[in-house]
Amino acid sequence: MKRTVIMMLDSFGVGAAGDAAKFGDLGSDTFGHIAKACAEGEADIGREGPLTLPNLARLGLAHAAMESTGAFAPGFADNVELIGAYGHAQELSSGKDTPSGHWEMAGVPVLFEWGYFSEHQNSFPKELTDKILARAGLDGFLGNCHASGTTILEELGEEHMRSGKPIFYTSADSVFQIACHEGTFGLENLYRLCEIAREELEPYNIGRVIARPFDGTGPSDFARTGNRKDYSLEPPAKTVLDKLKAAGGEVVSVGKIADIYAYCGITKKVKANGLEALFDATLAEVKSAGENTIVFTNFVDFDSHYGHRRDVAGYAKGLEYFDSRLPEMLALLDEDDLLILTADHGCDPTWQGTDHTREYVPVLAYGAGLKAGSLGRRNSFADIGQSIASYFKLEPMEYGESFI
C-alpha cells in the first residue's frame, strides 16, 4: 500500500541558506541556536538541560544540520544508528514566507515577487482601506502598521473592543492580518471582513489575508484562539497534491494545510489546534488512510507560538514533545509507506526582530525502500514534490529532482 505522510515543522530551519545575506539572515540557525541555548542552560523554562531529540536524530536531523552548517549542533554527534535518509534543501522561491515554502515543496516554486507593505507605520494605502471599510460597513480601523500579533493585542485590544474597529497590521511577509475579538466583533464577521480584504487585495499581489481572532478581557489575558483562518491565493500551477487528487487519490489536510493551498488538491480537511491535537489527528488519519493517500500536517505552533515570539525554551520543549511521539507514527507505517519531515522556512527564536529567517530546511525521509544515509544538499524544496510524484507514479513535476 502506498501512502505518504508529510509532517511539516513550520519554521524549523537548519542553518542560514546560501542566499541568506540577501534577506539580512546570514548566521541564522533555528535548530542550531536552540540546541546551543539548551546546552548552555539558557532554555530551562518549562524544561531543562541539553536539547534531547533521539528519534529525530535517528531519522537524520543532526546529520542534515551538520551538512548544512559544517558542524554538529551542541549536544548532537555522529553517534546514533541512522534509520532515515536525510538532506537539507535550499529554497528556490523568491520569499521566505509560508505559501512559497509550501507550494515549492509540492513542486511549484514561487518565481515571481510577492507584493509587500514595506512601510512600518501607515503601512496600507488609503484607497485600499477605504474600499474595505466601505464594503464592510465599518467607520474605521486600528493599527495600520508592522507589528507582532501578540504585542498589538496588548496595545490595541481594549480600544478595539470599545470601538468595534478591526485591527489591521502586517509584517515583513506578504500578508494582511486582521485581529478581532470573537465575543465583541464576532468570528463570522471577522471571516466576512477577511473575504472582502482578500478580494480588494487582488491588485496588490499579497500572498495571504489572515484572520486573527482573539478572546480575553484585557491586555493581561488577551490570547489568540484556535480559529485562525488563512485566505491564500491559489498556487500558480498544479501541485503534486492536485495531481494525486486528479488520479483518484486522497489528500488529507491536518491543520492549516488546506488554507495555504487555497483548498486546491485537498480532498479532506481536519481541524486541530496545538501540537498534541495536531499529532493526535495525524495519527488518526494515518490509521484510517487507504491506498494512494497523502496525510499532510502543518505543526504551526513552532512558528506562531515559539519562532515569531522568540521563545527559545518553548520551541525546545515543543520539539522534545514532538520527538517523544514519533515512535507512535513510526509504528503505524507499513513497509511501503513514505514519511517525510521538513519545514517551510526558518524562524530563529534567537534572531533579531520577529520575522522568518531564510534558512535551509531539513529533508528527512523514511520508508519506501529508502536507504539510511545522506541525500545531500537539495537545490529546491521541489525535490520533495518530485519525489512524491515519483513515489505515486504520477506525471513528473516541472521542478525538482526526485530522491526516490
Swiss-Prot record:
<dbReference type="InterPro" id="IPR010045">
    <property type="entry name" value="DeoB"/>
</dbReference>
<dbReference type="InterPro" id="IPR024052">
    <property type="entry name" value="Phosphopentomutase_DeoB_cap_sf"/>
</dbReference>
<dbReference type="GO" id="GO:0009117">
    <property type="term" value="P:nucleotide metabolic process"/>
</dbReference>
<dbReference type="GO" id="GO:0005829">
    <property type="term" value="C:cytosol"/>
</dbReference>
<dbReference type="GO" id="GO:0006015">
    <property type="term" value="P:5-phosphoribose 1-diphosphate biosynthetic process"/>
</dbReference>
<dbReference type="GO" id="GO:0000287">
    <property type="term" value="F:magnesium ion binding"/>
</dbReference>
<comment type="function">
    <text>Isomerase that catalyzes the conversion of deoxy-ribose 1-phosphate (dRib-1-P) and ribose 1-phosphate (Rib-1-P) to deoxy-ribose 5-phosphate (dRib-5-P) and ribose 5-phosphate (Rib-5-P), respectively.</text>
</comment>
<dbReference type="GO" id="GO:0030145">
    <property type="term" value="F:manganese ion binding"/>
</dbReference>
<comment type="pathway">
    <text>Carbohydrate degradation; 2-deoxy-D-ribose 1-phosphate degradation; D-glyceraldehyde 3-phosphate and acetaldehyde from 2-deoxy-alpha-D-ribose 1-phosphate: step 1/2.</text>
</comment>
<keyword id="KW-0413">Isomerase</keyword>
<feature type="binding site">
    <location>
        <position position="356"/>
    </location>
    <ligand>
        <name>Mn(2+) 2</name>
    </ligand>
</feature>
<dbReference type="InterPro" id="IPR017850">
    <property type="entry name" value="Alkaline_phosphatase_core_sf"/>
</dbReference>
<feature type="binding site">
    <location>
        <position position="303"/>
    </location>
    <ligand>
        <name>Mn(2+) 2</name>
    </ligand>
</feature>
<comment type="similarity">
    <text>Belongs to the phosphopentomutase family.</text>
</comment>
<dbReference type="GO" id="GO:0006018">
    <property type="term" value="P:2-deoxyribose 1-phosphate catabolic process"/>
</dbReference>
<feature type="binding site">
    <location>
        <position position="10"/>
    </location>
    <ligand>
        <name>Mn(2+) 1</name>
    </ligand>
</feature>
<keyword id="KW-0963">Cytoplasm</keyword>
<keyword id="KW-0464">Manganese</keyword>
<dbReference type="GO" id="GO:0043094">
    <property type="term" value="P:metabolic compound salvage"/>
</dbReference>
<feature type="binding site">
    <location>
        <position position="308"/>
    </location>
    <ligand>
        <name>Mn(2+) 2</name>
    </ligand>
</feature>
<dbReference type="GO" id="GO:0008973">
    <property type="term" value="F:phosphopentomutase activity"/>
</dbReference>
<feature type="binding site">
    <location>
        <position position="344"/>
    </location>
    <ligand>
        <name>Mn(2+) 1</name>
    </ligand>
</feature>
<dbReference type="InterPro" id="IPR006124">
    <property type="entry name" value="Metalloenzyme"/>
</dbReference>
<keyword id="KW-0479">Metal-binding</keyword>
<protein>
    <recommendedName>
        <fullName>Phosphopentomutase</fullName>
        <ecNumber>5.4.2.7</ecNumber>
    </recommendedName>
</protein>
<dbReference type="Pfam" id="PF01676">
    <property type="entry name" value="Metalloenzyme"/>
</dbReference>
<feature type="binding site">
    <location>
        <position position="345"/>
    </location>
    <ligand>
        <name>Mn(2+) 1</name>
    </ligand>
</feature>
